[in-house]
Each structure stands twice: as structure tokens, then as C-alpha cells.
């Protein structure tokens, strides 16, 4: 399928670009999300990339040029997508859900709203400061949140002072914008 070819080509562009510009694991650029959508007569290709240190606009622009060149130099992709496609390469930005486990590292110290399942399978919502992230091999990856009271309620109980959550039990995590 041509869309699979496009996706694997974009993944390869991100990987090769990352190898060229990265100075270590923290600056390694990774693909967060990729969406291909029909937009009238054209196609919109949205590529979200990030690194543990964050990504700058000049890197997004350079990666966008590389992806566009890849599409335009591939006869099969050119035939399907033609010259009428919109390509957007950017970082995920604040306020959206975390989609890649390595994004947690970048957001250490920030406030997160998390929906997670406990050992019994019950769903809980908590807002807290991301204190620690452990993605090391040899054990299940986890994070540690320090819950904060949200809203104006004075009563009500907070969860324990720190919550350790396995990443596979997190249904959704969103970085909260603080002022």
C-alpha cells in the first residue's frame, strides 16, 4: 500500500535526520505521531517530532524539506500525492496528550493531568507534578507524580504524597499549562 510506503519513508527520514543532528540520547529526535488526511483534492501530512530536550523550529524546517524531497523523488509517491499535498512538521506543543514515552522525560518537573488504572482496574484521575521517569531496560517503565490539589476545594483527600505509576497503566496524560 502506498500510504505504508509514505509512513516508512517518513520514519526513515526522521531516523536519518536524528542521527545527523543528535549529540546524544537526550537530543535524539523521535517521531511522536504521524497522520495522513484527505483534505479536499489534496492530502495533509502531519508529522509530530520531539526530543528529550525539545526541538527547535529550524530542525522542523530542515526535516520538512527532507521529507518533501523524499516524497517528490519517489515516483510512486509522486503519482499518488502529486504536487498538491500539505506537509506540516512540528513539535507536539503543550496542552495535547503525551503520545510517546520519551516525552515524559522532557516534561519532568511539569504539572500533568493523568488518567490511570490501579491494580484492580479502577480508573482514577490525578493532577500532579512529574517528579521522576524511569525508562531503563530490565524493568517496567514508570513515573512518579507528586499530587497537587486542583480547584478551590479545601476539603477532600489527596492521594499519597507520591504516586508511582507503571506507564502501561496510564490511559492519558496531558501537560498542564501553568501561569
Curated annotation (Swiss-Prot):
It holds the Pfam family RimP_N. GO terms for biological process: ribosomal small subunit assembly; translation. Keywords: Cytoplasm, Ribosome biogenesis. The keyword Glycosyltransferase does not apply. The keyword Endoplasmic reticulum does not apply. SUPFAM superfamilies: YhbC-like, N-terminal domain (SSF75420). It is found in: Cytoplasm. Its main location: cytoplasm. One of its GO terms (cellular component) is cytosol. Belongs to the RimP family. NCBIfam families: PRK14641.1 (NF011234). Required for maturation of 30S ribosomal subunits. This is Ribosome maturation factor RimP. It comes from Prosthecochloris aestuarii (strain DSM 271 / SK 413). The gene is rimP.
